[in-house]
From Swiss-Prot:
It comes from the Bacteria. The gene is pyrF. This is Orotidine 5'-phosphate decarboxylase. Pfam families: OMPdecase. GO terms for biological process: 'de novo' pyrimidine nucleobase biosynthetic process; 'de novo' UMP biosynthetic process. The lineage of its organism: Bacteria, Bacillati, Cyanobacteriota, Cyanophyceae, Synechococcales. It catalyses: orotidine 5'-phosphate + H(+) = UMP + CO2. PROSITE patterns: OMPDECASE. InterPro entries: Aldolase_TIM, OMPdecase, OMPdecase_AS, OMPdecase_bac, OMPdeCOase_dom, RibuloseP-bd_barrel. The active site is at K65.
């Protein structure tokens, strides 16, 4: 399969930047479509970053990983969708009730301003966890992989549009879930890149051919001396025959 527009499958994380830095950076990557607004950027910019990104024709992936009681999660997702977030993360371990009401609230929020329904994504297990740390520190006695699978099932049954997982779990999850259930993965590195604080990583092409729907790119782009060239490199890498 050859992708018509590989840029649509890539999401750039602008962590560690303020609004001006983020906007300046995306101008360096003209083919960029999706931008991830995480905790750091949102904490410094608030909703201003939504307005600025959408004015530039970018799609917003709001990655705040909401995890609270159902009513609070519903309110947060309603407002996020109303402000134009097209992908929104929630922790799957918040439970079925919270996932169900958050998903419905997001649809209502978008509809209230004439926007299409966003896709809610259930966060499974953060890619910074190793299998040993996961079991030892959280005192969980089944495998990390089983936990990821269980949380992905919760998200799927609650009607969410996909989940966040490491590239190491993508192949197994794709065997379980249909293509319509998005598997979005951070932890993307080339062999000549460092691991930084990620523990479960994979190269772009390998993650994509394993079944990932979209890839979240961070430091392999933001730390590059030529971000546009680095982005193009990933686009070429995920093109499959």
């Amino acid at each position: 399969m050859t992708l018509v527009n590989p840029s649509e499958k890539l999401i750039l994380a602008l962590d560690g930047m303020d609004v001006l830095e983020a906007l300046s950076f995306i101008d360096k990557v003209p083919d960029l479509i999706w931008v991830k607004v995480g905790l750091e950027l949102f904490a410094t910019s608030g909703l201003e970053i939504f307005t600025e990104l959408r004015a530039r024709g970018k799609k917003v992936f709001l990655d705040l990983k909401f995890h609270d009681i159902p009513n609070t999660m519903a309110g947060a997702c309603y407002r996020a969708a109303r402000n134009g977030a097209e992908l929104i993360t929630v922790h799957a371990c918040a439970g079925s009730k919270a996932l169900l009401v958050a998903n419905e609230a997001a649809k209502k929020g978008a509809a209230s301003v004439g926007l299409p329904s966003p896709t809610l994504l259930g966060v499974t297990v953060l890619t910074s966890w190793t299998s040993y740390e996961f079991g030892d520190e959280l005192d969980i006695h089944h495998s990390l992989e089983k936990r990821v699978e269980h949380l992905a099932q919760l998200a799927f049954k609650a009607g969410l549009g996909g989940c966040i997982c490491s590239p190491c779990e993508v192949k197994r999850l794709r065997e379980i879930f249909p293509e319509s259930f998005e598997l979005i993965t951070p932890g993307i590195r080339f062999l000549d890149s460092g691991l930084d604080d990620q523990a479960r990583v994979m190269q772009p092409r390998d993650a994509f051919t394993s079944g990932a729907s979209r890839l979240v790119l961070g430091r392999i782009i933001t730390r590059s001396t030529n971000p546009a060239e680095a982005f193009t490199r990933v686009c070429r890498d995920i093109q499959t025959d």
